[in-house]
Design a protein with these regions (language model features):
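Interaction interfaces in information-processing and related assembly proteins
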Residues: 2-183
Length: 183
């Protein structure tokens, strides 16, 4: 069962969110026939989208995430709404790259490093909030840590992981640590 748990630490100056998303990523793999590299990239982005969706306040609010790093996977787009209902796609779902020098999936090579992350939040105001920042390394976790710190002024550490086999998700989840005001 997928779940997001949040914990306040150190006199409520640190928020830790732990996300389990195996079912979400497994469904995406099956719907889009994702390669392992595409599954890792889209899965990591879906996890962040679900996390960000939990911050929306009512069912009229929604957000979109676009990652465009110029890599062979193409754009990654994720939509989330109130209650962390999330969906997304990757432009080139069949792209599979050789393992990187550490023996891991080369998500950074698939996403690319020449581009940006864009987040648009429709909070029901006159104009949607739009944040954009450059991609750091294409591995998605570091890119969102940078995005949260620079664009949302919330210093963060982000760890995301997707373990994908042929046409299935073995495990998927993340940990997001945010420094709150006064930390």
């Amino acid at each position: 069962m997928d779940v997001i748990k949040r914990f306040m630490l150190f006199d409520k100056t640190i928020l830790v969110s732990v996300i389990s998303a195996k079912e979400l990523v497994d469904k995406a793999i099956k719907i889009h026939s994702l390669s392992r590299t595409a599954a890792a990239a889209l899965g990591r982005t879906l996890i962040v989208g679900a996390y960000m969706g939990t911050e929306l306040k009512d069912d009229k609010q929604k957000l979109s995430i676009t990652i465009n790093g110029g890599g062979p996977l193409g754009r990654i787009v994720v939509l989330s709404d109130y209650g962390a209902k999330v969906r997304g796609y990757v432009e080139n779902p069949a792209v599979e790259l050789p393992l990187n020098g550490k023996g891991k999936l080369d998500v950074g090579g698939g996403v690319g490093k020449n581009g940006y992350i864009s987040v648009i939040k429709d909070l029901g105001l006159k104009e949607p909030y739009s944040g954009r920042c450059p991609i750091v390394d294409g591995e998605i976790a570091n890119d969102f840590a940078y995005y949260f710190t620079v664009s949302e002024q919330q210093p963060s550490a982000v760890a995301l992981g997707v373990l994908a086999a042929d046409n299935e998700c073995v495990s998927a989840g993340g940990i997001i640590v945010n420094a709150l005001p006064g930390a």
